[in-house]
Amino acid sequence: MTESRKPSRDPAGTASIPHFAARMEDRFHSFRERRARKRGLTSTVIAYTGYGAPGWVRVLCRVLLARPGATDDRAKKIRGWRSFTSVPVNDVAVTVDIGGTQRRVTADRGGVVDVVLEADLPPGWHTITVRTDESETTTAPVFIVDPDVEFGIVSDVDDTVMVTALPRPLLAAWNTFVLDEHARRPVPGMAVLLERLTRSHPGAPVIYLSTGAWNVAPTLTRFLSRQLYPAGALLLTDWGPTHDRWFRSGLDHKRESLARLATEFPGIRWLLIGDDGQHDEETYGEFADAHPDSVSAVAIRQLSGGEAVLAGGRSRAEGPPKSARTRWVHAPNGAGLAEQLSRAGLL
């Protein structure tokens, strides 16, 4: 077993001098962890879908406290408000097994492991395992992108593949803390659109990029699977304080994730899928201007009047930024976007 260094990327704000709110959150988590362990809870690992390329893989998982003997499936079914009251385990060692090679990594202050490791895996889907010293072994799917692939899909989640009410506070709280995946509604035609895109572009990676918290990852994964969306990695964030602010910026999370994908896969041109409620047009436009060779097109789902009100209005941008090299398509549903993408030669 080899020891890997902690990633230079700092997804949970583990700076040397954390913000006052982050220090208070750490103390609160430590208090809750001590109480939970007195009740007999032990660590369990919730594994998320990872991705990579020949030579490396990005591993994503989270360590929480659960009853001894709780299976990974049972832990994943914690939903609604309970997912946000679960106790994370920070700074715990996690063993990652990739093709028989084991490495030790460390969870961040939110219990999240987000690390890139060397791996000798061929293109396609693979299974790795993750565990702590006291937990059962958990499996995680990872998708290794073929170096010859030149097309990929990045899709927003809220109001793009799933009808939500974010960010209106009361409805956002209801959707996040109460509803499970059975009560969430898919956007008409979007699952078919993404499935057609993956058939038209074999081997294309699919990334679901959201400002949602890691707590809801199991619920979102079950929703996407139940609605027959293509399998892919979820890139979520931590809603808590960071080393320099009270709350993490969702927009910065999306911008940084897109820039990272452009660096990790310089040969891929991404189809960016989002909606016109708030910031997707602005975020995608900025990325297309900064990385024109990394964008094949931008597909924007147009919200209905009622959805736009619930989402806090439409984008304030005076139309999407028009990069000379980027095609933009707009439609209210997946079928309309598919028709326009077909005309553009992407379907």
Residue ranges of predicted features:
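Intrinsically disordered, serine/threonine/proline
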Residues: 1-141, 145, 334-336, 341-347
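C-terminal cap/substrate-recognition subdomain and adjoining C-terminal extension
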Residues: 2-15, 212-347
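Secondary-structure boundary elements
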Residues: 133-135, 147-148, 187, 195-203, ...
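Short beta-strand elements
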Residues: 136-151, 157, 171
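Asp-based phosphoryl-transfer active-site loop
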Residues: 151-166, 284
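Short, flexible helix-coil linker/hinge segments at the edges of structured domains or between repeats
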Residues: 161-185
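Short, acidic loop-to-helix structural element flanking the phosphoryl-transfer center
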Residues: 180-204, 214-218, 256
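Short, surface-exposed connector motifs at secondary-structure boundaries
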Residues: 199-207, 263-270
